[in-house]
Structures are given as C-alpha cells and as structure tokens.
Regions:
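Active-site core of glycosidic bond-cleaving carbohydrate-active enzymes
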Residues: 3-174, 178-189
Length: 190
C-alpha cells in the first residue's frame, strides 16, 4: 500500500516505490486492471486494509470515489485498449470495472466499514443496469464462472468476499425467498 497516493502500488527489487505512479494504468504490476481495482484485493482482511487507509472514513471516501472518478485510463504495458478497459468506459461507473472480475467484490467492502446501505445501493445499481434477459444483459466476460457467480450470489443477497472462508457479506436480495437444496436433504432458506 502506497500511503502517499492511497492505492496499492509496486516496489522495485530494492524495495523502492516504482516511478510514475498512475492509478489509471492498466497492466504493468497489475493483470487486467489498475491500481483502482487491485487496491481492494485484500479479501482476507478488509479491516487491515481500512487501517492501512487510515480508518473507515478514508476507506469509505476512497470506495465512494471509485464510482464517481472519471473513467479515464492509461493502457500501460498492454500498448492498446484491451476489452476490459473498453467495457469499463462503456459501463460508465467511474473506475468501477464490473465487467472485469478483480473488482467485483469491492461493493461488498462497505459492509465491513459500517456502511452496508452503500453495498445495497451499488449492488442494485449494478444488477439493474448490467444484467437482464436481453441480448446485452450480461456485461464483460466470464473468467471461470466469476461473473455469473457474482450475480447469483448477489441476487440471493449474500456473497463470499474471501473465497474459502465460511463467512458471507450481506447484500440486497432480488427475491423474497430463496431455497438452496443441500446434501442429505437439508435446505438453506434466505
């Protein structure tokens, strides 16, 4: 975490911050994303990320800014506009690039820093704007089922922010009732 800029960034082999910080640069130290996206990839410790950022209020401010920042970009080491960049610009949600998987969980981080209504607001905005039964009702691509899994979990009202951990962040369900049929005849009802 680069405190001077408030984002994740990379260091060189000697431990010095890499020159020319640009939060909108895709590629370089990041795969299919920029510092705007990968800063939130502390799935296992959102509270620790909040501490790095100076507490809940600065983290909320940074998350808020992701949705309203200009959707400008620097194609960086890719040398051209990859489809993930084009999708972020077309979706027009600031630096939030929902069509690209590395940042999809970030909406749920509001749950961890005391503002779950912002999780609910952004979830509904994304689900209503980017998913439908029409020919353009599915944004981005499908890396190993992540985008559809994000939608299914979010539509049910919860999401595994940290894969492999037995906990879920609460969202805003689209359904009044969902029943998951589990092994041995058990049901989980939301």
């Amino acid at each position: 975490y680069y405190p001077e800029h408030g984002f994740m960034w990379t260091k060189d082999a000697k431990g010095n911050w890499r020159d020319r910080f640009d939060a909108t640069e895709w590629g370089g130290p990041f795969t299919e994303g920029s510092s705007w996206h990968w800063t939130w990839s502390v799935f296992h410790d959102p509270e620790g990320l909040s501490e790095l950022m100076g507490g809940h209020e600065p983290m909320v401010a940074r998350l808020d800014s992701m949705f309203v920042a200009p959707n400008t970009y620097n194609h960086g080491t890719y040398g051209f506009v990859i489809h993930e960049i084009a999708e972020m610009v077309a979706l027009n949600m600031g630096q939030y690039a929902h069509g690209n998987q590395p940042v999809q969980h970030a909406i749920y981080l509001y749950d961890y820093i005391g503002q779950p209504w912002k999780t609910q607001y952004h979830l509904r905005n994304v689900m209503d704007k980017l998913y439908n039964s029409g020919s353009k009702g599915y944004c981005g691509d499908e890396d190993n089922g992540q985008t559809s899994a994000w939608y299914v979990f979010s539509a049910m009202g919860f999401y595994p922010v940290c894969p492999g951990m037995p906990e879920y962040a609460v969202g805003s369900p689209l359904f009044k009732k969902v029943t998951l049929h589990l092994p041995e005849g058990k049901n989980f009802v939301v």
